[in-house]
A protein has these predicted regions:
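Generic N-terminal targeting/processing segments that precede catalytic cores or assembly contacts
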Residues: 1-313, 320
Length: 320
């Protein structure tokens, strides 16, 4: 019936209303693109507690988003079978029982609750001067070759390169025509983070960020800075030099992605989330029932063909 979220740790006195959250939910609302689910949800948030007379009280903030267009009947043909790429099998193995009407806690619909809570954290961090830029770095085999922050808002795929966005759209059309889906890479840049946040061992900043991003269901890998590319570099190529000017120490490059030794170094924090293709595709796939019978399954219903848009927003908010 609804998606909920509870946010702990927000200090008292932050100006907050439902519209502050709603603007973020509008950006990930279903049905805004040919490549996302056709499900129509208003995604209207209600603040149930933790705010009084437009200010946070310091107590937990409870949020509610009501579902208005759920169709449980769409899942009737998978009630007793395991969908490839989904968590149906592992849910059954862990709990011995599952609700087959969607993915439950592994559903993309869970994004709404995370985004609503993250919107509050974004507002708090913005008051400290910390800002975020998130975009699709690649969709399928199509990668960006240029960067325009304005262009991110000009296309449905949130790519900062208009030419790449056009090519990615053509690629997604091919996926649609073949009843398939696409993965991609989301990049997030966090600016104005002071040096020294994090810890040296158990609470490393990069480990904390990776833990948060990997909690998003579609994410299969996280990179920080140059990521896996550092394996191809020499030490002299990978090391970020330091320079002092007017009493301020900064780096000459940012291969480390703003984090060294588990702590922020004052430069931009750069991370990438690798998103798997949406597993709900209409092609016939081999699977089994919960009683062990082999069968060919065709998944019906309203599903994303690409999750980069809403996962990108979720990545930004999980970095809060």
């Amino acid at each position: 019936k609804a998606i909920g979220a509870v946010l702990d740790g927000c200090p008292a006195g932050l100006s907050l209303c439902e519209e502050d959250i709603q603007v973020f939910l509008y950006r990930i609302k279903p049905g805004q693109s040919r490549y996302t689910t056709a499900r129509k949800e208003g995604d209207l948030v209600e603040i149930l507690s933790g705010v009084f007379e437009g200010k946070t009280t310091g107590t937990p903030i409870s949020l509610l988003i009501r579902n208005t267009d759920q169709r449980s009947r769409d899942y009737g043909n998978i009630a007793y079978s395991y969908r490839p790429g989904h968590a149906d099998f592992t849910f059954d193995q862990k709990y011995g029982f599952r609700d087959y009407r969607g993915g439950g806690r592994s559903s993309g619909r869970e994004t709404a609750g995370r985004v609503a809570a993250g919107a509050i954290a974004i507002k708090l961090l913005n008051e400290l001067g910390i800002t975020f830029t998130t975009y699709a770095r690649s969709i399928g085999p199509v990668e960006i070759r240029s960067f325009s922050e304005e262009e991110i808002r000009n296309n449905a795929l949130c790519m900062p390169d208009a030419d790449a966005a056009a090519k990615a759209s053509a690629y997604l059309e091919q996926c649609l025509n073949s009843q398939d889906s696409a993965g991609g890479v989301i990049e997030c840049r966090i600016k104005n983070v002071p040096a020294g946040l994090g810890d040296t061992v158990f609470d490393k900043l990069d480990a904390t960020l990776a833990h948060a991003i990997m909690s998003i269901g579609a994410v299969k890998a996280v990179e920080i800075g140059d990521g896996i590319n550092v394996t191809r570099l020499t030490g002299s190529e990978d090391n970020d030099g330091f320079v002092q000017k007017d009493g301020i120490i900064s780096k000459t490059s940012n291969h480390a992605g703003g984090i060294m030794g588990g702590m922020s170094d004052g430069s931009d924090i750069i991370l990438r989330a690798h998103i798997k293709p949406t597993p709900s595709i209409s092609q016939s796939q081999s699977t089994v029932t919960n009683t062990g019978e082999n069968l060919e399954l065709e998944i019906k219903g309203r599903h994303d063909r690409s999750e980069e848009r809403r996962v990108g927003k979720e990545c930004q908010l999980r970095c809060r």
